[in-house]
Amino acid sequence: MAKKMLNKVMDFLGLEEEIDEIEEMDNEAIVEGNEEIDNIFDSSNVRNQKGKVVSIHTTTSTKVLILKPMDYDAAIEICDNLKSRKIIVVNMTSLESKIAQRLLDFIAGASYALGGSLDEIDKGVYIVSPSNVEITNELKNELSTKGILNWTK
């Protein structure tokens, strides 16, 4: 402790070179770092560890639910399934138009908040998909570019 105090006083007065101390500290840090690296790459540690075999192919099954809601209360079930990353086909043809619109607005908001998508399949039939599923409609794209009857050949 007395040595530290003496060093501080000498440093304050500028009587001792700081370069020697910095070099000593750097050398100590290099030696400690080399010891840590040696411990990490010690061959006995590597041989004792067993490798893990991980299957690249995962067997996740995607579920598609087909629901025909009878009232507005079905919105909670639909949104819970969407949160569980399930694809839902919703048939709203049997609902009154005002209730169907409210239900559709609720589902669209939940889908947007979860990063999913809501697409109309047919009048009153919608597909709600989570963010990890992409829905494409190649027929719709083909019809928009070519037309229904291609008379311009």
Swiss-Prot record:
Q: Which UniProt keywords apply?
A: Cell cycle, Cell division, Cytoplasm, Septation
State the superkingdom. Answer: Bacteria
Recorded GO cellular component terms are:
cytoplasm
Where does this protein reside within or beyond the cell? Cytoplasm
Has UniProt tagged this entry with the keyword Hydrolase? no
GO terms of biological process kind: division septum assembly; FtsZ-dependent cytokinesis
- Give the primary localization class: cytoplasm
- One Pfam family here: SepF
Q: Which family does it belong to?
A: Belongs to the SepF family.
**Which PANTHER family does this UniProt record tie to the protein?**
CELL DIVISION PROTEIN SEPF
User: What is the annotated role of this protein in its UniProt record?
Assistant: Cell division protein that is part of the divisome complex and is recruited early to the Z-ring. Probably stimulates Z-ring formation, perhaps through the cross-linking of FtsZ protofilaments. Its function overlaps with FtsA.
Q: Summarize the subunit comment.
A: Homodimer. Interacts with FtsZ.
- What protein does this entry describe? Cell division protein SepF
Write down the species.
Clostridium novyi (strain NT)
The record lists the lineage as: Bacteria, Bacillati, Bacillota, Clostridia, Eubacteriales
Supply the gene name. Answer: sepF
